């Protein structure tokens, strides 16, 4: 569907100049090219094309403007041509020559010649002439099929055609045809038509023709992006998406988990910090740490909530650090940090991991940073799957500044700001007292006062403030402001403003409004601070009639959708950044309430009179409970129209009209004569007359409106802020269009329709056009006086965003290719989210409209329509989407009544026409109604024709027949206790309903029934009904023999309409069957496959209707089957069923299942399994494979479900249903023959080589260890040999495509001469844990690499095309290759040694694979050939029951299916190895019972849910398998939430009887039963029989001894031989040494192995292992084998379904008992910490600050002592003796500390075992970082000692001490200078000077002293051999320090005293005096000797 404008010439122009033309239609403009130096005539000759999605209306306009073009100044308008398209719509082709008009609408001489063509998509108007635009008839057919191909990019300016070049016709046709048909279509030469204009630039077309001629797919060529589709391809519009049940407000389960790891840089001296974690009102505390500014906690807290999402996300998470908290005192707050839960939930994975929270003091905002707390915060809702980063081996090397606990985009330095919430006044409050109380009051007081005492309360960031109470006022006036102080930007998204009624007993909320700060601010470069109003906000809540116990009170609190207007509040908000340096600033963050400056009445906008009109065209589906009393519908807007409980006052003052208003109305609208002077004569009519409903069927009633449709109209007065709503509407229109397009594309991808990329281009084109249109429309009314600052800023922001979005859409459009559709679709989803966000206007104006159904004057059900959706504008884009349209509304119950099953029934379905606009625009209010009515006025008489009608009488009506083709449904809701249902469908259309037949006991009914609705009368014009037919409602019910039918779900559809004059032929008819999603509340409840057509009955009656030609072979009596042409085309398929066995069958009616059988049914055909004679003894079937043939649709999407039912055969021929399962999609079981058209191997190899050269950085030389693909002469795939070489000197793991220098950095088994600088780890020192931690490092690094690249599944699919070529590269190695490549880049960019340091540190250790998830998710549930089907019984639970599908599972059927078309081609059946016994199921092992040794290794658990009151748990492992139940209760781990178990358990089991392994974690309790924390279940049987060989993981290397010993009893060569035999693969052929050939692959590798004694022996195991690790590359039989691994499984608790209770790391090995016995289990017991002794000698101190003043002299001195500890102040604190009266800050100690400790090297943690409190039963193990704390103190005799300074040394990495005190600086400790870091565990002995620091008054670090210390680390054995004494004691005592004797007395030692008191203080003064004295002496000598000398000189002596 498109409109083409051919602009030919503009003539009679005046003067010479450059001309340009602008052509505008529907707001989208195209410019012509500039014609230079035109004189009289401008010959444009250009064609412009508009793809139009909706039919062109006959009233639409086309506008062409001609300008004089200027490069410098703006273009000057010459004239305008406007044309109404009525004639074009009727005739499809018009050519016009006409004059232009100027600005004043005066005709000018200049004329224009234009040709206009239009073709509607439905063919109702016009068709292209044979030779017009597309010449080829077949091409026209294709054009019709694809419906739309857009040929022109918006804004592209085609150049005019030079003579002699091909015409548009040929070029355009070849482009369109080539684009659409690709290589299947050849181009035909066409005769040239000289009069055809150019549409595309010729150069482009020539390039295009060259590119397309190559036979490539056109959509892979960038120039092909000119093909775009703007009309819907899928029939998505026929599926209206209507959600019935309110989702907001329903409580859900949430879990907030917070791990407090540590704190750093806490401000304060010698503090004892405790961290308090608050979520909402719940508080939890960590333990207290003494005397440290950087405490380490690692404590985990969990908070559980069951509340609605809105309440949850507004809760505040507060993390505070408190100093010296104990039982008696609450402690002093150091600092706190807060954010709301919603901020955390909106993060990726709903969590912050290892982030630092910045602490600030709320009581002193000028004090700055108070420290950091490192924590993990996660918020989990039910069903959320969170990827938790791995817990093990956390290092505390942290970049604090780069990892702050802040959402992305929030600056790290947040400033304090004041939030001023200004509350002005409120209006329209409801009365808040019962009428009884009101009468009592009146009796006592004697006057009727307003029955409400309102005040406003504001909640923000955990604080609240409230205004004063205005006594007895429905229209209170406050003019107050509530001031909050918080950091900006705040981490709390919403502010809650609530009007409350003050009451003696308890205050009640009247209404609530939430201010979303993101919507009233912008954080961009050109953004603005939050600002709002002054603007009115509307509040909604419960109905206005006051009752003491209001069941809907929650609605007034803002929970759930309000059902009635409550009040409106005039408020404003402003934010001011605070200058914290200002001395006058109040530094507290307490909420203040101040007076605010009053504002004028007109500030919020000029009051205008609005007019709302509505017409009820139909009211049906009225719930039968309301069917016995007359029903009326009431429409309200604000309090207007509410006659029951609306206005609190009887009279509302009319807004005064300004004097000029009347004249203005007179002039513009000529309305005043019609309205009899005063509009007050026009009384509002807000409700329909009461009418008694009539029966539709047993559930529903309808109102018999017939041709008389009741109307309502309401006048109301509101501030005129339409511009806000207009802008929101434009964006909504763009967003709706975009959403429709994206849904269409997703449907295309889902249903595999061709060319989704073309549709996406069309969507992007429409988006960019919409954005341009917004920019042109939104900038109106700039000078509006009542525009707030937010209006102005939002407009600028929206215009910037949409301009940017339009540009991005244009760029994306050019980039769309077939393989990038999914990526670009995601980007478009982001556009959609942004548009929806921008369109949500935060400043309200007109309240929403409520439609209430009243029965017996009581409110029953309601619908709410946003006013902006109904707002009228003369500009189409600004009009609300439902304005002047007939809208279908489904009325629902208010508040909580609408939850659950009560909300599923429709209360009423109303077809309603609504229009809202200014009274001045009232003449338009009937413009959208279906035509053919007469108005009925309320009053008669002259001058009343402008009065609105009270009802409409329709004289025009159309007769229709509806055919509902109900084919089948699938995955329906189980409504009976058997787990099945007896479903039937009821179809409602207008006032009629019909039912399908009932099908018993199925969840996938195939009704195959056509329902015909005759004698349907629809009112209005036929073409209107064609475009927008009424909605069909389909409800599915379960037939019950007793009681009424149970509701199972509902869906909606729109029929395809055929008019009487239309042919019933393709492409529109007959309609295609489609799936409609069935909803039950908000949950999906299956799919309905159906089609609906609405056929107009013409003058000839039903004879003209298409005949019903059903299948002739079936006679079903009165039931008409779906006719041919609509029912699917069937083909014969064979369904093979593998019956393996049944598992875990539960009792039926208390009786055990003994003789079960499985029945398989599909499309009426089926097969039964053999009977299991004794389920207890052997639950497997003895006949494995059976098959049946069935007719299935050709289209796989329409395949019916396959039903699996298990019955128990009882005595006397009875049988009982045990459970059932419906396979809703057979797709994954369909066998597809291999594709012979796969690209040839030559191409593959060529690509592979290219990949390798790229990966090797361009070098084509092959480094050792890479895969070399060589070609043998034979071409077929099977014969290709792949060489995988592995030299003895190279790695034991093939790393493919990795350059040599990267290889050096990888893990190796054997050392090489390549890396002399890297030490080999001593194998005797390594254990399994070394391997585990090395593997975790690798996993973490891989995850880190994946984060920035963000490869997700879709992208992975695309990458696979090339990745698949990379021979033997497994997933793990791919990731590692990428990791190494990235690391190499970062290192080369780094400098020298520093960048290589991390690489050198990593030792060469063999690794295993650590999976951060279950093994099943990595290997497709091990369902490679054996599938597990859960059998269900019992009713499906509803959300509110909290029941899950788990509870309905009564057993499992194991088997498989294979579906294929018959007969199979011979070559296919030969290649697939088809067998007459087992069919397609080849190589199936026997299912006889087998004994297996199961070995379970449980490594550790993480993040367990606390089970005890103290917030901890005492976990132990429990394992169940069959009858074996192991409880490892004795080895529980005390008070741990991250316990390391390190256990292995051996269990002998017999498959199939014992195949479900349960590993549970229990909490040990001293008293009472132990509680289950969580459990995980593993199906061992599927693992055992899987081709992935999950019995025992394949290790990375083969070793016969050491930590990496081979675990499997079978060696790699034996495993390889077995696999080749089972898979019928040729091989393995070993030899020569180090070489093996399997099928057509050759692997080479080391041929020797070293035994325990270091002897080298020849072996084939290395190459065999290499072949196993690349088994997926073996043709046909190859698949990925499970590597040696540890899997991480979530722990779940049945009591808390859907929420993880922690994670468990484990792996399972299985060994058949008939094979050689495996070796002893691996020892994975937790590493015992190693005992060490740290000896610290404190030699001296220097430059210690002097704290004490001497009593006599005032001299400064200090009594210094040094304190140190390693584990904690309480555990091992040690003090030196005191150096008294240090006058210089120098202290001499020679004092030794001894710290024995237990240390875990792998985790770099010290292990402490101690009782948590005196009441604790046992010791708890703690792990803390190895940090030595040294403090310097000033000793006082009477008062407490004074803390002077401290340093904390991390023993793994601390700065090397300075050699002298002078070289020791403060920067060594603060990290401001690069100091070499040392580890005491490597150096063993370190001596030096270290600085001691403390914070001054400004919270800045200052140097308070230096300490000379020596650290010496010994193991416990070494310490025992070489003992030393504590302090200065024996053995090996230290000598006494040589301290100056400062305990002197003046008169005994005056000189010494003088030295200390005078010299130290006045030494410089004394030196200067001495120097001066010497100079004076010298001068005196000179003067004394000069005379004598002079005399001698004179006398010449």
Curated annotation (Swiss-Prot):
The chain crosses the membrane at residues 1964-1984. Pfam families: C2, dsrm_Ferlin, FerB, FerI, Ferlin_C. Changing residue 1323 to K: In a breast cancer sample; somatic mutation. Ca(2+) 3 binds at residues 1508, 1514, 1563, 1565. Residues 1985-1997 are extracellular. Keywords: Calcium, Cell membrane, Cell projection, Coiled coil, Cytoplasmic vesicle, Deafness, Disease variant, Endoplasmic reticulum, Golgi apparatus, Hearing, Membrane, Metal-binding, Neuropathy, Non-syndromic deafness, Repeat, Signal-anchor, Synapse, Transmembrane, Transmembrane helix. Ca(2+) 5 binds at residues 1836, 1839, 1842. Changing residue 1011 to P: In AUNB1 and DFNB9. Ca(2+) 1 binds at residues 976, 982, 1038, 1040. Ca(2+) 2 binds at residues 976, 1038, 1040, 1046. The keyword Repeat applies. InterPro entries: C2_dom (IPR000008), C2_domain_sf (IPR035892), C2A_Ferlin (IPR037726), C2B_Ferlin (IPR037720), C2C_Ferlin (IPR037722), C2D_Ferlin (IPR037723), C2E_Ferlin (IPR037724), C2F_Ferlin (IPR037725). Residues 1370-1383 have a biased composition (Basic and acidic residues). SMART domains: C2, FerB, FerI. It is found in: Cytoplasmic vesicle, Secretory vesicle, Synaptic vesicle membrane; Basolateral cell membrane; Endoplasmic reticulum membrane; Golgi apparatus membrane. One of its GO terms (biological process) is sensory perception of sound. Binds Ca(2+). The ions are bound to the C2 1 domain. It is a single-pass type II membrane protein. The keyword Transport does not apply. It comes from the Eukaryota. Residues 1387-1396 have a biased composition (Low complexity). Isoform 1 and isoform 3 are found in adult brain. Isoform 2 is expressed in the fetus and in adult brain, heart, placenta, skeletal muscle and kidney. Residues 128-171, 642-694, 1299-1324, 1343-1405 are annotated as: Disordered. It is linked to Deafness, autosomal recessive, 9: A form of non-syndromic sensorineural hearing loss. Sensorineural deafness results from damage to the neural receptors of the inner ear, the nerve pathways to the brain, or the area of the brain that receives sound information. Auditory neuropathy, autosomal recessive, 1: A form of sensorineural hearing loss with absent or severely abnormal auditory brainstem response, in the presence of normal cochlear outer hair cell function and normal otoacoustic emissions. Auditory neuropathies result from a lesion in the area including the inner hair cells, connections between the inner hair cells and the cochlear branch of the auditory nerve, the auditory nerve itself and auditory pathways of the brainstem. In some cases AUNB1 phenotype can be temperature sensitive. The N-terminal first 124 residues can be classified as C2 domain, based on their 3D-structure. They are not sufficient for calcium ion or phospholipid binding. This is Otoferlin. It comes from Homo sapiens. The gene is OTOF.
């Amino acid at each position: 569907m498109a409109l083409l404008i051919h602009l030919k010439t503009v003539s009679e122009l005046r003067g010479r100049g450059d001309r340009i033309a602008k052509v505008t239609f529907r707001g989208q403009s195209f410019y012509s090219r500039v014609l230079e130096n035109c004189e009289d005539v401008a010959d444009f000759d250009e064609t412009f094309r508009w793809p139009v999605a909706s039919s062109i209306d006959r009233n639409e306009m086309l506008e062409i403007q001609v300008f004089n073009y200027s490069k410098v100044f703006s273009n000057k308008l010459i004239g305008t041509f406007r044309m109404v398209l009525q004639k074009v719509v009727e005739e499809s082709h018009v050519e016009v020559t006409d004059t232009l008009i100027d600005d004043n609408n005066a005709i000018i001489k200049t004329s224009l010649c234009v040709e206009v063509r239009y073709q509607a998509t439905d063919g109702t108007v016009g068709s292209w002439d044979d030779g017009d635009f597309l010449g080829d008839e077949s091409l026209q057919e294709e054009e019709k099929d694809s419906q739309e191909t857009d040929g022109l990019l918006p804004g592209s300016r085609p150049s005019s055609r030079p003579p002699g070049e091909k015409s548009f016709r040929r070029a355009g046709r070849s482009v369109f045809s080539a684009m659409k048909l690709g290589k299947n279509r050849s181009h035909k030469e066409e005769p040239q038509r000289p009069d055809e204009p150019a549409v595309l630039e010729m150069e482009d077309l020539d390039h295009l023709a060259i590119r397309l001629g190559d036979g490539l797919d056109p959509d892979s060529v960038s120039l092909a992006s000119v093909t775009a589709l703007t009309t819907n391809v899928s029939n998505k519009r026929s599926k209206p998406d209507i959600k019935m049940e309110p989702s907001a407000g329903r409580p859900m389960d949430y879990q907030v988990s917070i791990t407090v790891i540590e704190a750093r840089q806490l401000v304060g001296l010698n503090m004892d910090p405790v961290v308090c974690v608050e979520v909402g009102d719940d508080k939890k505390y960590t333990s207290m740490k003494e005397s440290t500014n950087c405490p380490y906690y690692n404590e985990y807290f969990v908070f559980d909530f069951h509340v609605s999402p809105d309440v949850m996300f507004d809760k505040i998470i507060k993390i505070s650090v408190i100093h010296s908290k104990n039982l008696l005192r609450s402690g002093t707050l150091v600092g706190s940090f807060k954010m709301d839960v919603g901020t955390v939930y909106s993060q990726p994975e709903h969590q912050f991991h290892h982030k630092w929270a910045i602490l600030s003091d709320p009581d002193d905002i000028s004090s700055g940073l108070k420290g950091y707390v490192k924590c993990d915060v996660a918020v989990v809702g039910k069903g959320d799957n969170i990827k938790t980063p791995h817990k093990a081996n956390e290092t505390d090397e942290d970049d604090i500044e780069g990892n702050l606990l802040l959402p992305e985009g929030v600056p790290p330095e947040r400033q304090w700001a004041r939030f001023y919430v200004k509350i002005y006044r409120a209006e329209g409050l409801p009365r808040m007292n019962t009428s009884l109380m009101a009468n009592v009051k009146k009796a006592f007081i004697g006057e009727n006062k307003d029955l409400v005492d309102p005040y406003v309360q504001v909640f923000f960031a955990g604080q609240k403030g409230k205004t004063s109470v205005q006594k007895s006022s429905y229209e209170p006036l406050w003019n107050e402001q509530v001031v909050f102080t918080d950091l900006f930007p705040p981490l709390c998204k919403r502010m809650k403003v609530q009007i409350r009624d003050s009451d003696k007993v308890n205050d009640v909320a009247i209404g609530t409004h939430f201010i979303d700060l993101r919507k009233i601010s912008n954080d961009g470069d050109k953004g603005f601070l939050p600002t709002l109003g002054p603007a009115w906000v509307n509040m909604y809540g419960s109905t206005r009639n006051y009752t003491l116990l209001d069941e809907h009170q929650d609605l007034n609190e803002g929970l759930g959708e309000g059902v009635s207007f409550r009040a409106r509040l005039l408020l404003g908000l402003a934010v001011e950044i605070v200058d914290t340096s200002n001395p006058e600033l109040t530094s507290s963050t307490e909420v203040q309430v101040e007076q605010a400056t009053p504002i004028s009445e007109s500030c919020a906008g000029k009051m205008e009179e609005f007019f709302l009109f509505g017409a009820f065209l139909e009211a049906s589906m009225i719930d039968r409970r309301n069917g016995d009393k007359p029903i009326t519908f009431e429409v309200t807007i604000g309090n207007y129209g509410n006659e029951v409980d609306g206005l609190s006052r009887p009279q509302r003052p009319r807004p005064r009209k300004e004097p000029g208003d009347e004249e203005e109305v007179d002039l513009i609208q000529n309305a005043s004569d019609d309205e009899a002077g005063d509009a007050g004569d026009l009384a509002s009519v807000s409700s329909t007359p009461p009418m008694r409903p009539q029966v539709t069927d047993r559930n529903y009633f309808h109102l018999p409106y017939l041709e008389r449709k009741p109307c309502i109209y309401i006048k109301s007065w509101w501030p005129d802020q339409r511009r806000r709503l207009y802008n929101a509407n434009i964006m909504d229109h763009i967003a709706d269009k975009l959403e429709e397009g994206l849904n269409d594309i997703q449907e295309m991808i889902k249903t595999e329709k061709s060319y989704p990329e073309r549709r996406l281009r069309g969507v992007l084109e429409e988006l960019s056009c919409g954005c341009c249109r917004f920019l042109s429309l939104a900038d109106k009314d700039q000078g509006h006086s009542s525009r707030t600052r937010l209006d102005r800023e939002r407009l600028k922001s929206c215009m910037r965003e949409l301009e940017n979005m339009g540009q991005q859409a244009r760029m994306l459009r050019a980039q769309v290719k077939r393989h990038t559709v999914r990526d670009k679709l995601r980007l478009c989803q982001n556009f959609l989210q942004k548009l929806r966000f921008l369109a949500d206007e935060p400043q309200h104006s007109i309240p929403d409209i409520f439609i209430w159904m009243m029965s017996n004057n009581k409110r029953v059900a309601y619908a709410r329509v946003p006013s902006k959706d109904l707002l009228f504008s003369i500009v189409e884009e600004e009009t609300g989407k439902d304005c002047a349209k007939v809208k279908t509304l489904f009325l629902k119950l208010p508040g909580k009544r609408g939850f659950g099953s009560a909300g599923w029934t429709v209360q009423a379905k109303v077809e309603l026409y609504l229009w809202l606009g200014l009274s001045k625009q009232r003449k338009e209010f009937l413009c959208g109604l279906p035509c053919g009515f007469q108005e009925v006025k309320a009053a008669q008489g002259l001058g009343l024709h402008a009065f609105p009608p009270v009802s409409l009488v329709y004289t025009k009506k159309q007769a229709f027949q509806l055919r509902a083709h109900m084919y089948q449904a699938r995955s329906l809701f189980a409504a009976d206790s058997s787990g099945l249902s007896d479903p039937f469908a009821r179809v409602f259309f207008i006032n009629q309903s019909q039912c399908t037949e009932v099908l018993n006991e199925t969840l996938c009914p195939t009704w195959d029934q056509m329902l015909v609705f005759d004698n349907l009368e629809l009112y209005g014009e036929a073409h209107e009904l064609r475009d927008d037919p009424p909605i069909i409602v389909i409800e599915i019910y379960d037939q019950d023999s007793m009681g009424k039918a149970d509701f199972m779900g509902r869906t909606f559809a729109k029929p395809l309409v055929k008019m009487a004059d239309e042919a019933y032929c393709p492409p529109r008819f007959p309609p295609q069957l489609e799936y409609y999603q069935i909803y039950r509340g908000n949950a999906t409840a299956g799919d309905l496959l159906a089609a609906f057509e609405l056929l107009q009955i013409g003058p000839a009656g039903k004879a003209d209707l298409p005949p019903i030609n059903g299948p002739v072979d079936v006679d079903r009596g009165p039931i008409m089957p779906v006719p041919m042409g609509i029912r699917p085309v069937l083909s014969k398929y064979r369904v093979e069923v593998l019956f393996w066995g049944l598992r875990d069958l539960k009792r039926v009616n208390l009786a055990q299942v003994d003789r079960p059988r499985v029945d398989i049914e599909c499309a009426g055909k089926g097969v039964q399994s053999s009977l299991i004679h004794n389920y207890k003894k052997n639950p497997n079937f003895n006949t494995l494979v059976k098959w049946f043939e069935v007719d299935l649709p050709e289209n796989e999407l329409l395949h019916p479900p396959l039903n699996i039912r298990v019955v128990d055969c009882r005595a006397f021929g009875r049988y009982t249903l045990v459970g059932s399962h419906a396979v809703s999609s057979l797709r994954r079981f369909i066998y597809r023959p291999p594709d012979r058209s796969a690209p040839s191997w030559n191409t593959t190899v060529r690509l592979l080589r290219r990949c390798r050269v790229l990966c090797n950085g361009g070098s084509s030389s092959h480094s050792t260890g890479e895969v070399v693909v060589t070609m043998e002469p034979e071409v077929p795939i099977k014969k290709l040999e792949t060489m995988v070489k592995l030299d003895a000197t190279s790695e034991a793991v093939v790393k493919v495509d990795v350059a040599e220098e990267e290889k050096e950095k990888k893990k190796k088994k054997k050392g090489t001469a390549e890396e002399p600088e890297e030490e080999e780890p001593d194998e005797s020192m390594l254990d399994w844990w070394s391997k585990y931690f090395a593997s975790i490092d690798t996993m973490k690094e891989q995850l880190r690499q994946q984060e920035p690249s963000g490869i997700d599944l879709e992208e992975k699919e695309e990458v696979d095309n090339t990745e698949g070529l990379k021979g033997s590269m497994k997933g793990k190695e791919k990731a590692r290759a990428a990791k190494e490549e990235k690391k190499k880049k970062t290192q080369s960019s780094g400098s020298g040694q520093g960048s290589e340091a991390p690489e050198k540190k990593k030792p060469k250790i063999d690794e295993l694979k650590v999976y951060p998830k279950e093994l099943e998710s990595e290997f497709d549930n091990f369902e490679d050939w054996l599938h597990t089907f859960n059998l269900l019984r019992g009713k499906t639970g509803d959300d509110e029951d909290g029941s899950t599908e788990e509870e309905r599972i009564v057993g499992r059927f194991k088997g498989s299916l294979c579906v294929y078309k018959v007969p199979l081609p011979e070559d296919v059946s030969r290649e697939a190895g088809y067998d007459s016994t087992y069919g397609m199921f080849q190589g199936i092992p026997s299912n006889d019972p087998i004994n297996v040794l199961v070995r379970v290794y449980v490594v550790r658990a993480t993040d367990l849910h606390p089970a005890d009151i103290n917030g901890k748990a005492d976990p132990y492992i429990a394992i169940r398998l069959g009858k074996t139940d192991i409880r490892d209760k004795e080895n529980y781990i005390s008070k741990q939430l991250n316990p390391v178990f390190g256990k292995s358990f051996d269990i002998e089991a017999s498959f199939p009887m014992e195949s479900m392994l349960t590993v549970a974690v229990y909490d040990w309790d001293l008293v009472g039963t132990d509680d289950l924390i969580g459990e995980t279940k593993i199906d061992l049987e599927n693992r055992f029989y899987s081709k992935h060989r999950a019995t025992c993981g394949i290790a990375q290397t083969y070793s016969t001894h050491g930590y990496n010993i081979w675990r499997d009893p079978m060696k790699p060569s034996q495993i390889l031989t077995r696999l080749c035999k089972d898979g019928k693969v040729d091989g393995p052929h070993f030899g020569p040494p180090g070489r093996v050939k399997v099928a057509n692959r050759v692997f080479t590798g080391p041929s020797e192995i070293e035994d325990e004694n270091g002897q080298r022996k020849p072996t084939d195991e290395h190459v065999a292992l290499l072949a196993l690790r690349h088994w997926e590359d073996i043709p046909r039989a190859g698949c990925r084998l499970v590597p040696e691994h540890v899997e991480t499984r979530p722990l779940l608790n049945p009591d808390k379904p859907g929420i993880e209770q922690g994670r468990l790391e484990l792996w399972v090995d299985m060994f058949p008992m008939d094979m050689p016995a495996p070796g002893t289990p691996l020892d994975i017991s937790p590493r015992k910490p190693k005992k060490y002794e740290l000896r610290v000698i404190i030699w001296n101190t220097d430059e210690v600050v002097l704290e004490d003043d001497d009593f006599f002299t005032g001299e400064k001195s200090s009594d210094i002592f040094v304190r140190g500890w390693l584990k904690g102040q309480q555990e091992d604190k040690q003090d030196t003796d005191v150096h008294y009266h240090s006058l210089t800050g120098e202290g001499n100690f020679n004092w030794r500390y001894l710290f024995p400790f237990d240390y875990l090297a792998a985790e770099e943690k010290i292990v402490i075992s101690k009782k948590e409190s005196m009441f604790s039963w046992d010791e708890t193990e703690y792990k803390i970082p190895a940090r030595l704390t040294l403090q310097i103190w000033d000793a006082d005799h009477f008062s407490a000692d004074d803390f002077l300074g401290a340093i904390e040394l991390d023993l793994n990495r601390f700065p090397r001490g300075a050699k002298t005190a002078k070289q020791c600086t403060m920067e060594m400790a603060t990290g401001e200078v690069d100091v070499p870091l040392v580890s005491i565990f490597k150096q063993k002995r370190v001596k030096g000077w270290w600085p001691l620091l403390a914070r001054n008054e400004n919270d800045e670090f200052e140097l308070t002293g230096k300490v000379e210390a020596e650290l010496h680390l010994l193991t416990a054995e070494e310490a025992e051999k070489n003992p030393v004494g504590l302090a200065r004691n024996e053995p090996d005592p230290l000598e006494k320090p040589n301290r100056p004797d400062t305990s002197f007395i003046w008169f005994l030692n005056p000189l010494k005293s003088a030295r200390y008191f005078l010299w130290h203080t006045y030494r410089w003064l004394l030196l200067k005096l001495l120097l001066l004295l010497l100079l004076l002496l010298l001068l005196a000598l000179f003067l004394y000797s000069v005379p004598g000398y002079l005399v001698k000189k004179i006398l010449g002596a």
